[in-house]
A protein has these predicted regions:
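Glycine-centered hinge/linker elements that transmit conformational signals in sensory
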Residues: 14-54
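Paired acidic/hydrophobic, glycine-rich loop segments that form the ligand-binding mouth/hinge
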Residues: 71-76, 93
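A bilobed periplasmic-binding-protein/Venus flytrap-type ligand-binding module shared by bacterial periplasmic
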Residues: 110-122
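Extracytoplasmic/periplasmic solute-binding protein
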Residues: 1-25, 70
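Short amphipathic alpha-helical coupling segments at ligand-binding clamshell hinges
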Residues: 33-40, 122-134, 142-143, 203, ...
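Ligand-binding "clamshell"
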Residues: 5-8, 83-102
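Short helix-initiation/N-cap motifs at beta->coil->alpha
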Residues: 51-66
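Long, aromatic- and glycine/proline-rich binding clefts that accommodate carbohydrate-like moieties
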Residues: 88, 95, 143-196, 221
Length: 221
């Protein structure tokens, strides 16, 4: 999300329509979104910085927040029920995600899932029909209510709601995302990029370049 707020992205499409990594600027491109975001993020793990608040000895963020040892946790709306189960007595409030000062536009991060029909499916018409029915306004609203998450449809998000659902819906409207080729592998890539930076194993720009190259390998480039 920090990279998106800084004006960058993680993957994009080239002139031929292929999905390619975009962590590192290509030849002739300007922009330091990835570097700015990674620098900001990793400074919290740098003992020489005033913002130093994290090290490997600390618990995972959600667990620390649920136990009352962390004052601020940035997560997804879908995590609210889990937090309540982890600590039913936790007293907390939910607010919109912080933004970069003087940013041109407000950006939030979100996870979006889509239906896809394999080319080898034996019943393509049936598969497309099911996908269509599940994406209707009625189905989308029912799924959102059942799962406790915002709908992916703007017409549903614009309907009047109460409580935190109003905040969640507003945040969903400004949410931005990127095409993730393999969530588990990309999570490992980002973790390695962060650890390579905080440990001093690689320079910040080198860590980004390596992550960009590893992302390219996932995409078969």
């Amino acid at each position: 999300m920090l990279i998106l707020q800084a004006g960058g992205t993680i993957t994009t499409r080239d002139a031929a329509g292929r999905l390619i990594p975009a962590l590192s600027p290509r030849t002739g491109e300007a922009g330091q979104a990835s570097a700015s975001a990674l620098r900001f993020y990793t400074e919290f793990a740098d003992p020489s910085k005033e913002d130093y608040t994290w090290n490997r000895a600390r618990a995972e963020a959600m667990k620390a927040f649920a136990s009352g040892d962390l004052a601020l946790y940035i997560g997804y709306a879908s995590e609210q029920p889990l937090l309540s189960r982890m600590n039913p007595n936790l007293n907390y409030a939910i607010a919109s995600v912080p933004q970069i000062r003087n940013a041109a536009r407000t950006i939030n991060g979100g996870r979006a899932y889509a239906f896809a029909t394999p080319r080898t499916t034996k019943n393509p018409v049936g598969a497309v029909t099911v996908a269509y029915l599940l994406s209707t306004a009625e189905s989308s609203q029912a799924l959102a209510q059942a799962l406790g998450i915002p709908s992916a449809r703007r017409d549903i998000l614009n309907q009047p709601v109460t409580g935190y659902d109003e905040l969640f819906n507003k945040q969903a409207i400004i949410a931005r995302a990127w095409l993730d080729p393999d969530p588990k592998k990309t999570e490992s890539i980002f973790q390695a990029m962060i650890e390579n930076t905080t440990s001093g194993t690689l320079l910040l720009t080198e860590a980004i370049t390596r992550a960009d190259q590893e992302m390219g390998q996932i995409l078969g480039l």
